């Protein structure tokens, strides 16, 4: 299994269990998330309640707490952040580029520098529709993960900066 860690913080942000599609000349990855239900307990002890005279709809004191979560957010313990306005986002991108560029090597660095402007404009065009997430450490100088919904979709898509991820074999 491959895990993708944030190059700046080491937080696990993605794994190969979630296939990605490269967008914006490979600078960004798009990953489909899914809403899932957690905590549902379905216990079947094989008894026939109607034969025992019990009400089939009786709860019998079991508190079955279910929660709907997005699989990627839950799996990698992503922490939602307040939304950014345009000025805050541009400030974050500039700092991110400054921190990330020295960690990239050769061709990767050139590709990143060449295409980051287009990727930034792409994200700016969607800014009001984006949700912002960081990894578990919640550091200030980390990669952001963006979530949004395509028109008419019920499940979110997640957008990652590809060059900000380090592939680690587990």
Curated annotation (Swiss-Prot):
SUPFAM superfamilies: Mss4-like. The keyword Calcium applies. Keywords: Calcium, Cytoplasm. It is found in: Cytoplasm. Transmembrane segments: none annotated. InterPro entries: Mss4-like_sf (IPR011057), Mss4/transl-control_tumour (IPR011323), TCTP (IPR034737), Translation_control_tumour_CS (IPR018103), Translational_control_tumour_p (IPR018105). Residues 1-170 form the TCTP domain. One of its GO terms (molecular function) is calcium ion binding. Its main location: cytoplasm. GO terms for cellular component: cytoplasm. It comes from the Eukaryota. PROSITE patterns: TCTP_1 (PS01002), TCTP_2 (PS01003), TCTP_3 (PS51797). Involved in calcium binding and microtubule stabilization. Belongs to the TCTP family. This is Translationally-controlled tumor protein homolog. It comes from Fragaria ananassa.
